[in-house]
Design a protein with these regions (language model features):
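Bacterial N-terminal signal peptides that target proteins for export
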Residues: 2-15
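Bacterial N-terminal signal peptides
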Residues: 12-24
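Sec/Tat signal peptide C-region and signal peptidase I cleavage site
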Residues: 25-31
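Interaction/scaffold regions that mediate signaling and macromolecular assembly across diverse proteins
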Residues: 32-275
Length: 275
C-alpha cells in the first residue's frame, strides 16, 4: 500500500460542540459533493444485530467490496463538514470490518499483526489498509489525525467501533451528515444506559463505573473535559432526569474502571457467550 501522504491545506468548516449538539460553522467552500452510504447502510441493517457483526456475511458480500472501492476513489474534502465527519466514521467502521476479514481473525482484533504474544510495531490500528481518495490510512490515522484533531466532538468515541465486545455497539445503519447529531446522541445513550457491564452509576456508593474509554485509553479523557468530574458532567446530559444524572453533574463521585473485553464483536462470539 502507498504510504500516508500529507494533504495540502484546504479551508475546512469548524465543528464545535455546543451543549445541545453539533454546531457547524460553514466555510467559504466551492460547491459541495455528496457520497451515498446506502450500500453500507443496507449491509449494516442486514448483518449487524444488537451491535454484533456477521463478519462472514460481510466477507462474502460483493456489495461490500464495491463500497470499499468507492471509498478508495472518493475525495471527502468535497463534502460539507458534517458529511465529512459521517464519512470518516463510516469509513473507519467499514475498514475495521475489512481488517478483521483480511486477516481471517475471529477471536480478537488484537491478534492481528501479533507474534510470540506481542503486537508488532504497527499493530492492527496502524496497518495502511484503509484507502480513501487514493491515500492509504491506518485506522489510527483516521481516528487520531482526522476525526479527533479536526473536530472537537467527543461523541465520536461512541461511534467508532474497534471490533471488540468492550466497544460501543456497532450501529445498524450508516452515519449521515443530516442526522449525525441525533445519531451520535443515540449512540451515547445506548452505550451509557444499556450496557451496565461497561457503564453504570451506583447512587448509594456515590460511585460511577466507567468504560476505560473515558478514563484510561490514550488521552481520551481530555476530549471529555480533562478530569473525572468533567467526564461526569459531559455524560450526565444523556441520562434522564433523576438521581443518577444529578450525581454525575455534581462531580461528587469516585470512578471505578470496568473491565474491557477484547473478544471480537461477532455474532458467533456473542452466541457463545450467551449474549
Amino acid at each position: 500500500m502507498r504510504a500516508l501522504r500529507r494533504h495540502a491545506a484546504r479551508p475546512l468548516a469548524i465543528l464545535a460542540l455546543a451543549l445541545g449538539g453539533l454546531t457547524v460553522v460553514a466555510s467559504p467552500a466551492a460547491a459541495q459533493a455528496e457520497f451515498d452510504h446506502g450500500t453500507f447502510d443496507a449491509l449494516l441493517h442486514a448483518h449487524v444485530r444488537n451491535g454484533m457483526v456477521d463478519y462472514d456475511a460481510f466477507a462474502a458480500a460483493p456489495e461490500f467490496a464495491a463500497y470499499l472501492k468507492r471509498l478508495a476513489a472518493f475525495d471527502p474534502t468535497t463534502l460539507s463538514q458534517s458529511d465529512q465527519v459521517a464519512f470518516w466514521i463510516d469509513a473507519y467502521n467499514a475498514y475495521t470490518i475489512q481488517l478483521v476479514n483480511a486477516h481471517h481473525e475471529r477471536e480478537s482484533i488484537r491478534n492481528i499483526n501479533k507474534s510470540f504474544g506481542f503486537i508488532r510495531g504497527y499493530g492492527p490500528w496502524k496497518e495502511k489498509l484503509a484507502v480513501v481518495g487514493g491515500t492509504a490510512y491506518g485506522l489510527d490515522d483516521i481516528e487520531q489525525d482526522i476525526l479527533r484533531k479536526r473536530n472537537r466532538e467527543p461523541r465520536i468515541h461512541f461511534a467508532l467501533v474497534c471490533a471488540a465486545m468492550g466497544c460501543p455497539p456497532l450501529r445498524g445503519e450508516a452515519y449521515v451528515g443530516n442526522r449525525l447529531d441525533a445519531q451520535l446522541d443515540d449512540q451515547a445513550r445506548t452505550f451509557l444506559l444499556a450496557s451496565p457491564g461497561k457503564n453504570r452509576v451506583d447512587i448509594a456508593a456515590k460511585t460511577v463505573h466507567l468504560s476505560p474509554i473515558f478514563v484510561e485509553f490514550r488521552d481520551y479523557i481530555h476530549d471529555f473535559g480533562g478530569s473525572e468530574a468533567a467526564v461526569g458532567r459531559f455524560i450526565s446530559r444523556f441520562y434522564p432526569a433523576g438521581a443518577e444524572r444529578d450525581l454525575l453533574a455534581s462531580g461528587q463521585f469516585r470512578v471505578e474502571k470496568t473491565p474491557y473485553d477484547w473478544t471480537l464483536n461477532s455474532q458467533a462470539n456473542a452466541r457463545r457467550a450467551g449474549r
